[in-house]
């Protein structure tokens, strides 16, 4: 899906919903302030958590606000991978085979983020194994 130029990089101005989710997203009027909080929370998480757990939690912090009309998951994964790279880890690629698990673990993370963190941990490991296989190591 391609986002139109008027909405690219701009906080959403309308209410959005995630189909299948029982957790409502914040209203558009709350997004700017919540995003300031997300930036601070990510900084705090990075100081306290293991880098892989911090990356997973940074992803969740962003995606729970869902600040854009489109591309929130992609941006959340970019943030997650930035945290990983800055901490000396390789990126975590979520296999298309695990997409349903990825979505359900995000939904479950509203109450307990352990399943999502485990998914990201295993994705970091699997991505590293894929790199090694490609290099015949």
Place the predicted regions along the sequence by residue.
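FIC/Doc superfamily catalytic core
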Residues: 1-70, 74-137
């Amino acid at each position: 899906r391609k986002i139109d130029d008027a909405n690219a990089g701009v906080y959403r101005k309308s209410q959005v919903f995630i189909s299948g989710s029982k957790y409502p997203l914040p209203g558009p009027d709350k997004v700017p302030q919540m995003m300031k909080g997300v930036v601070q929370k990510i900084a705090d998480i990075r100081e306290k958590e293991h880098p892989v757990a911090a990356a997973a939690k940074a992803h969740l912090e962003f995606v729970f606000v869902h600040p854009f009309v489109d591309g929130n998951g992609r941006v959340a994964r970019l943030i997650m991978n930035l945290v990983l790279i800055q901490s000396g880890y390789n990126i975590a690629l979520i296999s298309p085979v695990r997409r349903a698990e990825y979505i359900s673990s995000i939904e479950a993370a509203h109450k307990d983020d352990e399943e999502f963190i485990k998914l990201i941990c295993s994705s970091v490991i699997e991505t590293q194994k894929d790199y090694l296989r490609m290099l015949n190591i």
